Regions:
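Feature captures the catalytic cores and cofactor-binding loops of soluble hydro-lyases/lyases
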Residues: 1-120, 134-202
Length: 202
C-alpha cells in the first residue's frame, strides 16, 4: 500500500454535536478528489480506550470505491470474515464487536498513530511488516535503496553460509555490513519538512 495521507482525528464514545453522523464522512470522501492522490485514510482515535469498532464491511467497501489506497488507524475494526476478501489494506489496533457514534473531529491535520507522527500529504507505505512514512525528497530513490540494503545484508548472510564460522568472522561481517548501511544513511539523510496543507474541520 502506498499513497498520500489524509489524516484526521476521530471519536465514537459520544455522539457528535450535530445530528448527522455521516456529514464528516461526506467531507472526507469529497477530499479524496483533491491532490495529492491517491489518499491513504489515516485516523487517530481520541477515545482511550477505544469504545467501538470503527470500520466494518460498509467502510471497507466505501473507501476503495472512492479511490483510497488503504487505512492506517489506531481505531478498531469488525466484520473480519467479510472484509478479508475485499483487498483493501487496513492497519488497525485490533477488533471489537461493537458499534458506536463514529465521527471525525478534525480533518487534514497532523495525527499520531502508534507513535508515528503523520502529516497531511505524507507519503505513506504499508505492508506485512507494518507502516512508515517516506520523505518526499527521497521517495524516488527508495526502490534502489531497498536493493542496496538487501545487498549489504547479504554480507552477513553469505558469511553464515560458509562451512566454518567463528564469532570473530561474524563480527567482521557485521561491521562490514554496518559500514555499508552507514554510508547509505549518510547519502540519504535529509532534513524532514512536512508537506504543507491547511488543516480544516469536517
Amino acid at each position: 500500500m502506498a499513497g498520500y495521507a489524509l489524516p484526521s482525528t476521530f471519536r465514537s464514545i459520544t455522539p457528535p454535536c450535530e445530528e448527522n453522523l455521516y456529514r464528516s464522512i461526506h467531507a472526507q470522501l469529497e477530499a479524496f478528489a483533491e491532490p495529492p492522490s491517491p489518499p491513504v485514510i489515516t485516523l487517530q482515535n481520541l477515545d482511550d480506550p477505544c469504545a467501538s469498532a470503527t470500520f466494518g464491511e460498509i467502510m471497507y467497501s466505501t473507501y476503495p470505491r472512492f479511490g483510497a489506497q488503504g487505512l492506517i488507524t489506531s481505531c478498531l475494526r469488525r466484520n473480519l470474515q467479510h472484509v478479508e476478501g475485499l483487498g483493501f489494506l487496513a492497519f488497525t489496533n485490533g477488533a471489537l464487536a461493537a458499534h458506536g457514534y463514529c465521527h471525525i473531529i478534525l480533518m487534514n491535520v497532523p495525527v499520531t498513530v502508534d507513535g508515528i507522527i503523520i502529516y497531511p500529504s505524507d507519503l505513506s507505505h504499508g505492508d506485512w511488516n507494518g507502516v512508515t512514512t517516506i520523505p518526499h525528497q527521497i521517495a524516488s530513490e527508495v526502490p534502489q535503496v531497498c536493493h542496496e540494503i538487501a545487498e549489504a545484508e547479504t554480507i552477513i548472510l553469505n558469511y553464515l553460509k560458509q562451512p566454518t564460522v567463528t564469532a570473530t568472522g561474524f563480527n567482521a561481517a557485521r561491521q562490514e555490513c554496518g559500514e555499508a548501511l552507514s554510508q547509505l544513511g549518510r547519502r540519504l539523510r535529509v532534513e524532514y519538512v512536512p508537506a504543507t496543507r491547511v488543516g480544516r474541520g469536517p
